[in-house]
Design a protein with these regions (language model features):
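Conserved C-terminal helix/tail region of periplasmic/extracytoplasmic solute-binding proteins
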Residues: 264, 370-402
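A ligand-binding cleft/hinge motif common to bilobed small-molecule-binding domains
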Residues: 112-114, 273-292
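Mature extracytoplasmic/periplasmic domains
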Residues: 304, 309-376
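Short, polar/charged alpha-helical segment
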Residues: 31-39, 46, 51-72, 165
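N-terminal secretory signal peptides and thylakoid transit peptides that target proteins
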Residues: 2-17
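Periplasmic-binding protein-like
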Residues: 147, 161, 240-247, 255, ...
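Extracytoplasmic ligand-binding site segments that recognize negatively charged/polar headgroups
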Residues: 48-60, 76-83, 98, 102-260
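Short beta-strand->loop
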Residues: 122-134, 155, 183, 287, ...
């Protein structure tokens, strides 16, 4: 898969501020005004609440923000970010143009696309953050492109994700390095692999990866969805799934509900391969004694789909200043290093470590843990977010079970 095409699709002109964040903050009166206004505000941070590790990390951040800035951070736990989009959309329709229910949101992909296009986001603001100067916009271009949609300062990058497979090396000593090798492997090991049922997002990501590896037309997939070319563009996906499904768990007539269910099935030996969007997921679970130490993580050699997840501020947030301060702290080396540590979360950083001071760089020093990816593959950008719903609907029409 040509990496040059990916970068051409992604790169946006511009560069981050070339000064240290602390010095920038001291010399910028606008930021000083934001800091002063933020003190005493409460930030209602709407974010997925399905992980104890992530929830604990946000509790730690709340303590730091209270101590440093007198800001109260309240984690509003979501099952699906689409809940937030619907709520903010309803508030706008009802004329609630200020004093909104959400101040900060963990978003990306189709949710960002919807909020940006419907005028549901405050901004631009993110590239004005002092901490944004350390973001690796050159080496991680998805920090400025979200599912092929330019960010344009409307959300702040928070963490990285990439489709990653993991397997018990005691059962799978040689792991498939491509979708074609995976198909050959499942033919020889029927019933030992599956993927989460779309529209679960990792299941949908698996579909997009399969399409890209099997001849999906990139020019179309990285542009907004077109009904006129849908059948032709997605034909390689359905052909590949028709070949794959008979060899999956339950012969492809049932699908696991979630990556969590798949992980447990792998731990129980029912599945031998699984997948995740966090390259450190298996390492986290090995450290927690939930997976055996023989589990290894890997990515397809030519590359796998990856993206950045972001922080957005709804247009009608009541605490916009404090929300910016929270985002700035979550982008700091201290917060990013703790987030990257598998003992706390294991979410890869968006920062360029070579931009950091020696002391801040040292915060990220850690030995490679069992289960971590040892040979990272190139990151492929997400297809345009408008392709998600049509692909999911067609998958359900063809393969969905009630």
């Amino acid at each position: 898969m040509p990496q040059t095409l990916n970068r051409r699709e992604l790169l946006i002109a511009g560069s981050a501020l070339g000064v240290a964040p602390f010095a920038w903050a001291q010399s910028n009166p606008d930021w000083q005004r934001i800091e002063a206004a933020a003190r005493g505000q409460t930030v209602y941070f709407n974010a997925w609440g399905g992980s104890e590790r992530i929830n604990a990390y946000l509790q730690w951040a709340a303590g730091e923000l209270a101590q440093r800035h007198a800001i109260k951070l309240e984690h509003v736990k979501l099952g699906d970010t689409a809940e937030l989009v619907r709520r903010v959309r309803a508030e706008k329709a009802a004329g609630r143009l200020s004093e909104g229910s959400a101040d900060l949101a963990w978003i990306n992909g189709e949710n960002f696309l919807a909020m940006k296009r419907e005028g549901l986001l405050f901004g631009p603001w993110s590239e004005k953050l002092p901490s944004h100067a350390n973001v690796d916009t050159a080496g991680k271009p998805t920090t400025r492109i979200d599912f092929s949609e330019p960010v344009e300062g409307m959300e702040a990058p928070w963490g990285m994700a990439q489709l990653t497979f993991f397997a018990d090396s005691a059962r799978v000593p040689v792991q498939p390095a491509s979708m074609s090798e995976l198909l050959e492997w499942v033919r020889k090991n029927p019933g030992r692999f599956s993927y989460p049922k779309p529209p679960q997002f990792i299941g949908t990501t698996f579909l997009k990866q399969l399409l890209l590896e099997n001849g999906g037309e990139r020019t179309a997939l990285y542009a907004p969805h077109s009904a006129e070319v849908f059948a032709r563009t997605t034909a390689p996906l359905w052909a590949a799934l028709d070949a794959l499904h008979p060899h999956l768990w339950k012969q492809g007539r049932q699908f696991p509900a979630s990556p969590l269910a798949m992980r447990q099935m792998l731990a129980d030996g029912e599945l031998w391969l699984s997948l995740t969007f966090n390259p450190n997921e298996a390492a986290n679970q090995i450290a927690a004694k939930a997976l055996p130490a023989t589990v290894v993580s890997y990515q397809h050699a030519a590359g796998t789909i990856g993206n950045t997840h972001f922080l957005g501020i709804p247009f009608n947030a009541r605490a916009k200043e404090a929300a910016q301060l929270v985002a700035n702290f979550l982008l700091s080396p201290l917060a990013q290093a703790r987030k990257a540590d598998i003992r706390h979360w294991g979410d890869p950083t968006v920062l360029a470590l070579d931009k950091l001071s020696a002391a801040d760089h040292a915060l990220f020093a850690a030995a490679v843990a069992p289960g971590q990816v040892t040979r990272p593959a190139p990151t492929w950008p997400e297809p345009h977010g408008t392709w998600v719903d049509p692909i999911e609907r067609e998958w359900i029409r063809r393969y969905g079970v009630t």
